[in-house]
Design a protein with these regions (language model features):
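Lectin-like carbohydrate-binding module/patch detector with strong preference for beta-trefoil
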Residues: 1-176, 180-196
Length: 196
């Protein structure tokens, strides 16, 4: 088993978490206790997540839209416990371990529920699938691709036309894709992340 130290998760970045089908984990409702399901990626903050490091390989997964965390409903530990959004209460039901797989995907394991994996109800991977935890199975519904979200505002600023009288800069290079899969798997300090 590879350690989380092999997954690049930058402290100041946001990520999509995608199923094999390309559907991403999203906050359907951004209120306290709101649903978390799979959906088509539309560059919305409800679909983007920060991994907040809590310790050796342990993270809180924070939603970009509202700052709420992926949490276990009623702090459940049983197979089939649904995930929902909740404010940061410092509880271990909001802590997750990122475990790389040989295929380049990851399993997201509950630190609270004995390592059960984020999974979809009924093994669904299509849009609308509800998220839960379940003991490890060989199915694709527990395998996730974490991809960094490129800051669209910075990319747009590079391609804007200069104002009249301003010196025109070199043409912008082709825009990068909205999300690039995380391939290397190691922690990098925020300072090194800022250099790139």
């Amino acid at each position: 088993m590879k350690s989380v130290a092999q997954t690049v998760i930058a402290a100041e970045s946001f990520y999509t978490i995608a199923a094999k089908t390309g559907s991403v984990i999203q906050a359907v409702e951004t209120k306290e206790g709101g649903d978390i399901r799979l959906g088509k990626y539309e560059h919305k903050p409800e679909q983007e997540w920060a991994f907040v490091r809590e310790g050796d390989g342990v993270y809180r997964i924070r939603n970009r839209a509202n700052g709420k965390l992926i949490d276990l409903m009623m702090t459940g530990t049983a197979n089939g416990t649904w995930l929902h959004l909740w404010e940061d209460v410092g509880g271990t039901s909001q802590m997750w371990t990122v475990e790389p797989t040989p295929a380049g995907t990851v399993r997201l394991r509950s630190h609270w529920a004995g390592g059960k994996c984020i999974d979809t109800v009924g093994m669904g991977t299509a849009e609308g699938a509800i998220l839960q935890i379940w003991q490890e199975t060989p199915g694709d519904d527990q395998l996730w691709t974490i991809a960094e979200v490129k800051d669209r505002a910075k990319r747009a600023a590079k391609t804007e036309e200069p104002k009249a009288g301003a010196v025109k800069a070199e043409p912008a290079k082709a825009a990068e894709p909205a999300a690039a899969p995380v391939a290397a798997v190691e922690e990098k300090p925020a300072e090194k992340a800022a250099e790139k």
